[in-house]
Amino acid sequence: MSQPWQPTASIKQLKQRAAVLSSIRDFFAGKEVIEVDTPAMSQATVTDVHLHTFQTEFVGPGYAGGQTLYMMTSPEFHMKRLLSAGSGPIYQICKSFRNEESGRYHNPEFTMLEWYRPDFDHHDLMNEMDELLQLVLQCDKAERMSYQQAFIQELGVCPLEGTMEQLKGVARTLGLADIADPEQDRDTLLQLLFSMGVENKIGQQVPAFVYDFPASQAALAQINPTDNRVAERFEVYFKGIELANGFHELANGDEQLVRFEQDNMKRISMGLKPQPIDLHLIEALRAGFPDCAGVALGIDRLIMLALKLDHIDQVTAFPIDIA
């Protein structure tokens, strides 16, 4: 029986984890993508209503009253500042922090792989990510489907044109009436249906890329110029697990600022505290952000799947409950 001080991952599994990380670095070195290192804390943070941050106070010289700092939920904002400064293609493997659940697929502190490719759109980046997944997971080429196709295929309703009542009707067939019937926000309802009725059905044999999410869920992605109902965003699923979230990145600083402000208005309407907007990012976008695509991938989940394990604690030395 293991003792409380011991790692939850075996030494063998930690060595296998190290080998996967080494293969990822070799993959990017072969493509001349530069590894970078950015801060784990920032004076600003994400405004996304679905993300919850850790924060602390810096009380060093000049900050007698304390400076609030936020642990980064991803390295995205700092990496985009590097891109605007002319870095070219970059990647990072780092710790990220989200003040949310812990469990089979979640730990508040986790390892993220994030990379950006100037002159790529989201389809180009899906191609490259498919290469990486085949390397690490030893799987066949991924399948691809639009968000609309996935909804119609698995739930029989169009997420872009279906009425709220039609969406709630589908939720009732899934046994989700108690949650869905009082819901007034369309995106919340769509996310509920996707998580409960689509995610666990796609990508069972090979990874599945789902692209062109509703424009209302664009976040930091561009709107599709030929169909303004959808955003140039994708997610990746395998064995019912979300692995990654990628964008054809929004380059317009003014539009990004509006989206952040809209997020904060939504946070207030939901009884959540508005978050400080990263104005350094906004100015970096305004200064000249390259046309590019970027993606964030959960390393712990990826390695768990690569090793055919069923809990991220098996590939993490010290999860939150024994950290």
Swiss-Prot record:
- Write out the transmembrane intervals: none
Binding locations of substrate? S74, P75, E76, Y116, E249
Which top EC class applies here? Answer: ligase
According to its UniProt record, the EC number is: 6.3.2.-
Q: What family, per the record?
A: Belongs to the class-II aminoacyl-tRNA synthetase family. EpmA subfamily.
Name the chain's protein.
Elongation factor P--(R)-beta-lysine ligase
Species, as recorded: Photobacterium profundum (strain SS9)
Question: What is its quaternary makeup?
Answer: Homodimer.
Its gene is: epmA
